[in-house]
Protein backbone atom coordinates (compact mmCIF):
# COMPACT_ATOMS: atom_id res chain seq x y z
CA UNK A 1 0.00 0.00 0.00
CA UNK A 2 1.25 3.51 -0.82
CA UNK A 3 2.73 5.35 2.17
CA UNK A 4 0.28 8.23 1.96
CA UNK A 5 -2.56 5.78 2.64
CA UNK A 6 -0.93 4.13 5.66
CA UNK A 7 -2.24 5.09 9.09
CA UNK A 8 -0.12 6.17 12.04
CA UNK A 9 -0.77 3.43 14.58
CA UNK A 10 0.79 2.47 17.90
CA UNK A 11 -0.36 -0.91 19.16
CA UNK A 12 2.23 -1.37 21.90
CA UNK A 13 1.37 -0.40 25.45
CA UNK A 14 3.77 0.73 28.15
CA UNK A 15 5.47 -2.21 29.91
CA UNK A 16 4.71 -0.81 33.35
CA UNK A 17 0.97 -1.08 32.57
CA UNK A 18 1.13 -4.87 32.08
CA UNK A 19 0.36 -7.69 34.53
CA UNK A 20 1.22 -11.03 32.89
CA UNK A 21 1.21 -14.74 33.66
CA UNK A 22 1.81 -17.89 31.63
CA UNK A 23 -1.56 -17.80 29.85
CA UNK A 24 -3.02 -14.41 30.72
CA UNK A 25 -2.12 -10.78 30.29
CA UNK A 26 -3.84 -7.70 31.68
CA UNK A 27 -3.07 -4.16 30.54
CA UNK A 28 -4.27 -1.32 32.76
CA UNK A 29 -4.83 1.35 30.11
CA UNK A 30 -6.56 3.83 32.41
CA UNK A 31 -7.95 3.65 35.93
CA UNK A 32 -11.28 2.74 34.26
CA UNK A 33 -10.25 0.75 31.19
CA UNK A 34 -8.63 -2.70 31.22
CA UNK A 35 -7.47 -5.00 28.44
CA UNK A 36 -7.80 -8.72 29.22
CA UNK A 37 -6.07 -11.41 27.15
CA UNK A 38 -6.00 -15.19 27.48
CA UNK A 39 -3.97 -17.58 25.31
CA UNK A 40 -3.28 -21.28 25.89
CA UNK A 41 0.05 -20.87 24.10
CA UNK A 42 1.05 -17.78 26.08
CA UNK A 43 1.35 -15.72 22.87
CA UNK A 44 -0.22 -12.27 22.96
CA UNK A 45 -0.91 -9.60 20.35
CA UNK A 46 0.85 -6.22 20.37
CA UNK A 47 -0.07 -5.08 16.87
CA UNK A 48 -2.97 -2.69 16.25
CA UNK A 49 -6.28 -4.08 15.03
CA UNK A 50 -9.17 -2.79 12.96
CA UNK A 51 -10.79 -1.53 16.16
CA UNK A 52 -7.82 -0.68 18.38
CA UNK A 53 -5.21 1.66 16.88
CA UNK A 54 -3.45 3.01 19.94
CA UNK A 55 -2.55 1.39 23.28
CA UNK A 56 0.11 3.87 24.33
CA UNK A 57 -1.72 5.30 27.34
CA UNK A 58 -0.06 6.87 30.37
CA UNK A 59 0.20 4.25 33.11
CA UNK A 60 -2.39 4.94 35.84
CA UNK A 61 -1.94 4.20 39.52
CA UNK A 62 -2.82 0.61 40.41
CA UNK A 63 -1.80 -2.14 42.80
CA UNK A 64 -1.37 -5.88 42.22
CA UNK A 65 -1.80 -8.73 44.66
CA UNK A 66 -0.46 -11.92 43.09
CA UNK A 67 -0.96 -15.22 44.91
CA UNK A 68 -0.67 -18.81 43.71
CA UNK A 69 -4.31 -19.16 42.65
CA UNK A 70 -5.57 -15.61 42.80
CA UNK A 71 -4.66 -12.36 41.08
CA UNK A 72 -6.11 -9.00 42.11
CA UNK A 73 -5.70 -5.67 40.33
CA UNK A 74 -6.99 -2.57 42.06
CA UNK A 75 -7.36 0.96 40.68
CA UNK A 76 -9.26 4.00 41.87
CA UNK A 77 -12.37 2.83 39.99
CA UNK A 78 -12.34 -0.98 39.77
CA UNK A 79 -11.10 -4.12 41.52
CA UNK A 80 -10.41 -7.29 39.50
CA UNK A 81 -10.30 -10.79 41.02
CA UNK A 82 -9.09 -13.70 38.85
CA UNK A 83 -8.22 -17.30 39.74
CA UNK A 84 -5.78 -17.73 36.82
CA UNK A 85 -7.94 -20.20 34.89
CA UNK A 86 -9.55 -19.82 31.47
CA UNK A 87 -11.68 -16.68 31.36
CA UNK A 88 -15.30 -17.33 32.35
CA UNK A 89 -17.94 -15.90 34.72
CA UNK A 90 -16.81 -18.47 37.30
CA UNK A 91 -13.15 -17.49 37.19
CA UNK A 92 -13.03 -13.71 36.71
CA UNK A 93 -15.05 -10.80 38.03
CA UNK A 94 -14.58 -7.05 38.40
CA UNK A 95 -16.15 -4.80 41.01
CA UNK A 96 -16.87 -1.26 39.83
CA UNK A 97 -16.52 1.10 42.74
CA UNK A 98 -19.05 3.73 43.85
CA UNK A 99 -22.12 1.43 43.35
CA UNK A 100 -24.09 2.57 40.30
CA UNK A 101 -26.85 -0.03 40.77
CA UNK A 102 -28.95 -1.35 43.62
CA UNK A 103 -27.29 -4.72 43.16
CA UNK A 104 -23.72 -3.54 43.47
CA UNK A 105 -21.17 -3.04 40.74
CA UNK A 106 -19.93 -6.59 40.22
CA UNK A 107 -19.41 -7.70 36.61
CA UNK A 108 -18.86 -11.38 35.88
CA UNK A 109 -16.77 -11.99 32.79
CA UNK A 110 -18.85 -11.94 29.61
CA UNK A 111 -22.16 -11.01 31.25
CA UNK A 112 -24.29 -8.36 29.56
CA UNK A 113 -26.90 -8.21 32.32
CA UNK A 114 -26.99 -7.88 36.10
CA UNK A 115 -29.30 -8.16 39.07
CA UNK A 116 -31.91 -10.69 40.15
CA UNK A 117 -33.95 -11.10 38.06
CA UNK A 118 -31.33 -10.41 35.40
CA UNK A 119 -31.79 -7.22 33.43
CA UNK A 120 -29.86 -5.40 30.73
CA UNK A 121 -29.31 -1.65 31.03
CA UNK A 122 -26.96 -1.11 28.12
CA UNK A 123 -27.63 2.07 26.14
CA UNK A 124 -26.91 0.21 22.89
CA UNK A 125 -24.71 0.92 19.92
CA UNK A 126 -25.54 1.53 16.27
CA UNK A 127 -26.70 -0.45 13.26
CA UNK A 128 -24.17 -0.83 10.46
CA UNK A 129 -26.75 0.24 7.91
CA UNK A 130 -30.43 1.14 7.78
CA UNK A 131 -30.89 -0.42 4.35
CA UNK A 132 -34.29 -2.14 4.13
CA UNK A 133 -35.33 -0.69 7.48
CA UNK A 134 -38.66 1.03 8.05
CA UNK A 135 -38.49 2.90 11.35
CA UNK A 136 -37.42 0.37 13.96
CA UNK A 137 -38.30 -2.58 11.71
CA UNK A 138 -36.29 -4.56 9.21
CA UNK A 139 -38.37 -5.12 6.08
CA UNK A 140 -37.80 -8.47 4.37
CA UNK A 141 -38.14 -9.37 0.71
CA UNK A 142 -41.76 -10.54 0.90
CA UNK A 143 -44.89 -8.37 1.18
CA UNK A 144 -44.98 -6.74 4.62
CA UNK A 145 -42.50 -9.35 5.82
CA UNK A 146 -40.72 -8.07 8.94
CA UNK A 147 -37.67 -9.72 10.40
CA UNK A 148 -35.01 -8.89 12.94
CA UNK A 149 -31.42 -8.43 11.80
CA UNK A 150 -28.93 -10.25 14.03
CA UNK A 151 -25.31 -10.43 12.92
CA UNK A 152 -26.22 -10.55 9.24
CA UNK A 153 -28.96 -13.14 9.84
CA UNK A 154 -32.68 -12.65 10.34
CA UNK A 155 -35.16 -13.76 12.94
CA UNK A 156 -38.82 -13.76 11.92
CA UNK A 157 -40.05 -13.89 15.50
CA UNK A 158 -38.98 -10.34 16.35
CA UNK A 159 -38.95 -7.31 14.09
CA UNK A 160 -36.72 -4.90 16.02
CA UNK A 161 -33.53 -3.60 14.41
CA UNK A 162 -30.64 -4.94 16.50
CA UNK A 163 -28.38 -2.09 17.64
CA UNK A 164 -25.92 -4.34 19.46
CA UNK A 165 -24.01 -3.59 22.65
CA UNK A 166 -22.81 -0.03 23.19
CA UNK A 167 -20.00 1.52 25.21
CA UNK A 168 -22.30 3.21 27.74
CA UNK A 169 -24.30 1.35 30.36
CA UNK A 170 -26.35 2.61 33.28
CA UNK A 171 -24.88 -0.20 35.40
CA UNK A 172 -21.55 1.63 35.25
CA UNK A 173 -19.63 -0.97 33.26
CA UNK A 174 -19.52 -2.61 29.85
CA UNK A 175 -17.04 -4.37 27.57
CA UNK A 176 -16.26 -5.17 23.96
CA UNK A 177 -14.58 -8.19 22.39
CA UNK A 178 -11.73 -7.54 19.95
CA UNK A 179 -10.77 -11.21 19.55
CA UNK A 180 -11.97 -11.55 15.95
CA UNK A 181 -10.93 -8.24 14.37
CA UNK A 182 -8.15 -8.26 11.80
CA UNK A 183 -4.58 -7.21 12.51
CA UNK A 184 -3.27 -3.99 10.94
CA UNK A 185 0.16 -4.48 9.42
CA UNK A 186 2.82 -1.77 9.10
CA UNK A 187 2.41 -1.74 5.31
CA UNK A 188 -1.27 -0.80 5.69
CA UNK A 189 -2.78 -4.19 4.88
CA UNK A 190 -4.78 -6.42 7.23
CA UNK A 191 -4.38 -10.08 8.19
CA UNK A 192 -6.28 -12.56 10.40
CA UNK A 193 -5.09 -13.02 13.96
CA UNK A 194 -4.32 -16.38 15.54
CA UNK A 195 -7.35 -18.41 16.55
CA UNK A 196 -8.11 -19.28 20.14
CA UNK A 197 -6.87 -16.04 21.71
CA UNK A 198 -9.22 -13.97 23.86
CA UNK A 199 -8.86 -10.18 23.67
CA UNK A 200 -11.50 -8.26 25.63
CA UNK A 201 -11.64 -4.64 26.85
CA UNK A 202 -13.50 -3.74 30.03
CA UNK A 203 -14.82 -0.20 30.61
CA UNK A 204 -15.89 0.84 34.10
CA UNK A 205 -16.72 4.53 33.68
CA UNK A 206 -19.88 4.64 35.75
CA UNK A 207 -22.23 7.31 34.37
CA UNK A 208 -19.38 9.40 32.97
CA UNK A 209 -20.33 8.53 29.40
CA UNK A 210 -18.44 11.43 27.85
CA UNK A 211 -15.19 10.26 29.45
CA UNK A 212 -15.84 6.68 28.30
CA UNK A 213 -16.30 7.77 24.68
CA UNK A 214 -13.32 10.12 24.92
CA UNK A 215 -10.98 7.34 26.07
CA UNK A 216 -12.41 4.92 23.52
CA UNK A 217 -11.54 7.40 20.76
CA UNK A 218 -7.98 7.54 22.12
CA UNK A 219 -7.93 3.76 21.84
CA UNK A 220 -9.63 3.40 18.47
CA UNK A 221 -8.60 6.61 16.73
CA UNK A 222 -10.68 9.71 16.13
CA UNK A 223 -13.84 9.56 14.06
CA UNK A 224 -12.87 10.22 10.42
CA UNK A 225 -14.28 13.48 9.14
CA UNK A 226 -14.80 14.53 5.55
CA UNK A 227 -12.24 17.13 4.48
CA UNK A 228 -13.77 20.55 4.04
CA UNK A 229 -12.75 20.76 0.40
CA UNK A 230 -15.11 17.95 -0.65
CA UNK A 231 -18.19 19.71 0.71
CA UNK A 232 -18.17 22.80 -1.49
CA UNK A 233 -20.48 25.78 -1.17
CA UNK A 234 -23.66 26.66 -3.00
CA UNK A 235 -23.67 30.41 -3.48
CA UNK A 236 -26.95 31.93 -4.58
CA UNK A 237 -27.41 35.65 -4.19
CA UNK A 238 -29.30 37.89 -6.56
CA UNK A 239 -26.91 40.81 -6.67
CA UNK A 240 -25.56 43.14 -9.30
CA UNK A 241 -22.01 41.85 -9.26
CA UNK A 242 -19.15 43.53 -11.04
CA UNK A 243 -15.82 42.00 -11.92
CA UNK A 244 -14.33 43.75 -8.89
CA UNK A 245 -16.97 42.49 -6.43
CA UNK A 246 -16.67 38.96 -7.83
CA UNK A 247 -12.95 39.05 -7.16
CA UNK A 248 -13.49 40.38 -3.65
CA UNK A 249 -16.00 37.61 -2.93
CA UNK A 250 -13.76 34.79 -4.18
CA UNK A 251 -10.73 36.19 -2.38
CA UNK A 252 -12.72 36.24 0.85
CA UNK A 253 -13.68 32.59 0.36
CA UNK A 254 -9.98 31.87 0.00
CA UNK A 255 -9.08 33.84 3.14
CA UNK A 256 -11.77 32.04 5.17
CA UNK A 257 -10.68 28.64 3.79
CA UNK A 258 -14.20 27.91 2.59
CA UNK A 259 -14.34 25.71 -0.53
CA UNK A 260 -16.29 27.15 -3.40
Walk through the language-model features, giving the residues of each.
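Active-site pocket-lining segments that scaffold enzyme catalytic pockets across diverse folds
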Residues: 259
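Active-site mouth loops of central-metabolism enzymes
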Residues: 234-242
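Catalytic and substrate-binding clefts that recognize carbohydrates or anionic sugar/phosphate headgroups
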Residues: 65-228, 237-238, 250-255
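Short, Gly/Pro- and small/polar-rich lid/capping loops
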Residues: 2-13
Amino acid sequence: MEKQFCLKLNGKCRPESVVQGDKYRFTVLTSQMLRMEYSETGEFEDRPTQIVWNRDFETPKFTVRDQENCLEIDTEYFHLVYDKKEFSPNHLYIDVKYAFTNYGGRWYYGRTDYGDPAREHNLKGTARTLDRCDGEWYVGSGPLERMRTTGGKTNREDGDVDLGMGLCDTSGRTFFDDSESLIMEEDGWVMPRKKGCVDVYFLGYGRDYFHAIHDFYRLSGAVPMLPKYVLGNWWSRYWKYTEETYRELLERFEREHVPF
